[in-house]
Amino acid sequence: MFDRINILKQKGYSPDLILDIGAHHGNWTYSMLQIYSNCEYKLFEAIDYTELNRYNNIPNITRYNAVLNNKIEEIPWYEMRNTGDSMFKEKTYHFDNCNIITKTTNTLNNLLVIPESIKNIFIKIDCQGAEIPILQGASNLLDKTDFILLEIPLFGQYNENVPSFLEHIKYMDSIGFIPYDITDNHYINNFNMQLDVIFINKLHPFNIVVNELLMKK
């Protein structure tokens, strides 16, 4: 994954703000800091893992203990304290006897006020099927967002009631984003069940550059 993101940097892309949504223990942010060390980071995680305390006193990193959604409401939360925790129950045996907790959700629109100084946002969402609801609650951020990295289903259904691959593509198109790159394939029992896909804002200059480069001799 990070080799693909590093190529973005080599092409001249540098975000002002990176949102790590579904931060878990913060390992994704740690790897991103090796690429973009100076930008602002905001980490969102439903569980207050002690592993995230390493970011407590870093000026350009802010943590949020929140379950993100498209509205503020109480929802059933399926929790085993691992990467499968979600409002959409994982369909593996690991969650056969999981704890069901009532949690109150929040939205990015409610939690964040983006200052004028922030012009370029990179969003990563890995939330076990909640990607579309989270983006529905983030409409105020999208005009300044260049790239959105999502984990989306491809074949089969890993979580209950999650939109399909095609529904994700159509939704992203409806909010002004198209596929840019595939950074990872997640094979389970030799089936390619999930993809990590970077979507690009349709108005980003790379949409013009890609075709201009085709014409160069």
List the model feature ranges, each with a label:
Residues M1-K217:
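Phosphate/nucleotide-binding beta-alpha loop and adjacent structural elements of enzyme active sites
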